[in-house]
Amino acid sequence: MVTVSEQTAQGHVIEAYGNLLRVRFDGYVRQGEVAYVNVDNTWLKAEVIEVADQEVKVQVFEDTQGACRGALVTFSGHLLEAELGPGLLQGIFDGLQNRLEVLAEDSSFLQRGKHVNAISDHNLWNYTPVASVGDTLRRGDLLGTVPEGRFTHKIMVPFSCFQEVTLTWVISEGTYNAHTVVAKARDAQGKECAFTMVQRWPIKQAFIEGEKIPAHKIMDVGLRILDTQIPVLKGGTFCTPGPFGAGKTVLQHHLSKYAAVDIVILCACGERAGEVVEVLQEFPHLIDPHTGKSLMHRTCIICNTSSMPVAARESSIYLGVTIAEYYRQMGLDILLLADSTSRWAQALREISGRLEEIPGEEAFPAYLSSRIAAFYERGGAITTKDGSEGSLTICGAVSPAGGNFEEPVTQSTLAVVGAFCGLSKARADARRYPSIDPLISWSKYLNQVGQILEEKVSGWGGAVKKAAQFLEKGSEIGKRMEVVGEEGVSMEDMEIYLKAELYDFCYLQQNAFDPVDCYCPFERQIELFSLISRIFDAKFVFDSPDDARSFFLELQSKIKTLNGLKFLSEEYHESKEVIVRLLEKTMVQMA
């Protein structure tokens, strides 16, 4: 929306603490406003984080080396905003929405003061108008459409337009760049406004027009432990806390590859640059199993790595969720992966310390919980004006020091999310992938998913709970056996322990390097879980613990082989038939 620019203020630096500057200004300034600081004739982007009388404190998003007293500061009159429109998919941005591939053309390193438009003028889009002259529209109403990959990108009345407007001119169908004016309108006061394919929105304000509805669709991710034991709904929230080396990033990469959603927003917030490079190298060559096209066609990457300024970590998190909310308004299912929210919290702690605020637990700011809650609450499912449903599922990785789940960031996250996938260093060291510990993890969506799947598989919810009980009992018996040995437990307990190990080894674990087992579709999960449930219900009588262990090891080996065979192939049916015959033979001979 094109409007008259607001009056801006100016000021001068009077004090500096790292990337935090104290500025005395003349004019009008508001909290969250974008400012530009002149350092060695380079304008550095900053954000107002505290206003007190005629002084403000601004956090600069880039290196402030060379900043001095008296340096000129200008205020834009705008909040920190995201540029939204066609062309964001397949994009690679930093936390301030600069296109990194464009910056890379100028230099191998990120030069401070460089700002690039997120949506290029060079790309042309086939615009089809939908609204007509004389139509009365409000924010979020459809102006036209352009194709973006396999999606129909809806060009909507900007969400910053809060008044009802009447269209006075509409561009004809054709090929234009994103910044071309495609419609003009007049509001009730007679004020003229023009609309392009691009709109801007403050990243720290929730972006929604429509009605929030309860999440009710299952999100299939191809990991048996998540889909069965710790399910997540589209529009839900979940977290993946774990110590260093437990596999948080690997798990998030799996979700970005195989989750049954339309668009994935990958936010690398403070993680190592090498992990981002891995994504950039792999994703263009990987095929989306749901569409058969490159994964990059549905992916947007925001990479603010640990080597970038601390202040930009916060903006990268909010930028990612704003882009996700924008695509949700088109009736699409979005998955936002934030890796890691702990780095964001550490940035908050650093800024809070420089502001001399009263610290909370472990020196984190007292408002940490409310900030984390506000972030996760931006997820959810909605019904848009045209009746379509969109969803935003948020997954946040948490990196507690030493794997301590009692620290403030993890506890604040657990209070608001719908599912908790706790990663275990012990399971990771034992090469149990994914290293999610089923004994400490939980999902508030378990009963709801059970009710949905009851229509497909009778007794699904009860069977899943029974499997979880086997795991708990098996873990208790295993700990007892470590103390007293196998001779100290009854044969019945030994059988429960071996069944729990079988379930863990053959169902909950998957081979990430196997082209078949790395992704398990839901139909295959149902069939395999039915086989495991049959083993749970079977009664065996063994002469000795060695006989029991030998039988279950053979069974494990055969089921593991089955997991690596193409689903419903001839080899698959033959292998499954061998397992069924072995079960029936053992039950007949020993029962």
From Swiss-Prot:
It is an enzyme of class 7 (translocase). Transmembrane segments: none annotated. It comes from the Bacteria. GO terms for molecular function: ATP binding; proton-transporting ATP synthase activity, rotational mechanism; proton-transporting ATPase activity, rotational mechanism. GO terms for biological process: proton motive force-driven plasma membrane ATP synthesis. SUPFAM superfamilies: C-terminal domain of alpha and beta subunits of F1 ATP synthase (SSF47917), P-loop containing nucleoside triphosphate hydrolases (SSF52540). Its EC number is 7.1.2.2. ATP binds at residues 242-249. InterPro entries: ATP-synt_VA_C, ATP-synth_a_Xtn, ATPase_a/bsu_AS, ATPase_F1/V1/A1_a/bsu_N, ATPase_F1/V1/A1_a/bsu_nucl-bd, ATPase_F1/V1_b/a_C, P-loop_NTPase, V-ATPase_asu. The keyword Transcription regulation does not apply. Keywords: ATP synthesis, ATP-binding, Hydrogen ion transport, Ion transport, Nucleotide-binding, Translocase, Transport. It catalyses: ATP + H2O + 4 H(+)(in) = ADP + phosphate + 5 H(+)(out). NCBIfam families: PRK04192.1. Produces ATP from ADP in the presence of a proton gradient across the membrane. The V-type alpha chain is a catalytic subunit. PANTHER family: H(+)-TRANSPORTING TWO-SECTOR ATPASE (PTHR43607:SF1), V-TYPE PROTON ATPASE CATALYTIC SUBUNIT A (PTHR43607). Belongs to the ATPase alpha/beta chains family. This is V-type ATP synthase alpha chain. It comes from Chlamydia pneumoniae (Chlamydophila pneumoniae).
